[in-house]
A protein has these predicted regions:
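Fe-S-dependent hydro-lyases/dehydratases of central metabolism
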Residues: 1-195
Length: 195
């Protein structure tokens, strides 16, 4: 489902889902109870408290033998070490800044933040990283199209077209990637060392 999320949800979206593991590769997604989700579906609106954010950046290089479980465990272990055992992620929004992770890795990382007890997560990227992520997702969809998996409504081709439109918006400056305000305040800031 991640590939579809890469193309159907843009980086400005706010998503409400009925699962604590509701995460998207772009935008910010909140897990909520069924009543809150029902109200959101019925009215298009929802009221919920927005928690503080924790800014997470990465330095170093991910080793070829590492996968995202290693990154998740390293992130959690280093965070606990740096904050004297306090889980600063619990109940907060993790704002993932790409740093040295490539776009696809960073967007995948946000999906794992539920394991860190975060309320939500969002990936902050620059224009080039966001375009790279959209291009990766497009190529995966094109493989499905080439294998004859599109339907008579050309839903898969529509996803490719949507990605092309978003790429055009980014390149033209019409709708830049979501980025925090220059004076954004955080509960904490934390850098993960991948070395």
């Amino acid at each position: 489902h991640k590939v579809l999320n890469d193309l159907t949800v843009d980086d400005w979206a706010i998503i409400i889902g009925g699962d604590s593991h509701t995460r998207m590769s772009k935008g910010v997604a909140f897990g909520a109870d069924s009543g809150t989700v029902a109200i959101a579906l019925a009215t298009g609106e929802v009221t919920m408290p927005i928690p503080d954010s924790v800014k997470v950046t990465f330095k170093g290089e991910m080793m070829p033998y590492m996968d995202f479980r290693d990154v998740v465990h390293a992130t959690q272990a280093q965070m606990l070490d740096n904050f004297n055992g306090e889980n600063i992620f619990q109940g907060r929004i993790i704002e993932v800044h790409i740093g040295t992770l490539i776009a696809d890795e960073a967007f995948t990382f946000t999906d794992w933040t539920a394991e860190m007890k975060a309320k939500a997560s969002i990936c902050i990227s620059d224009s080039d990283a966001l375009i790279d992520s959209l291009e990766i997702a497009k190529e995966r969809i094109k493989v499905m199209i080439d294998k004859g998996m599109d339907n008579s409504l050309f839903v898969l081709q529509g996803l490719v077209n949507k990605a092309d439109k978003r790429i055009s918006e980014i390149k033209s400056g019409l709708k830049k990637p979501l980025f925090p305000d220059s004076d954004a305040k955080y509960y904490a800031e934390f850098e993960v060392n991948l070395d």
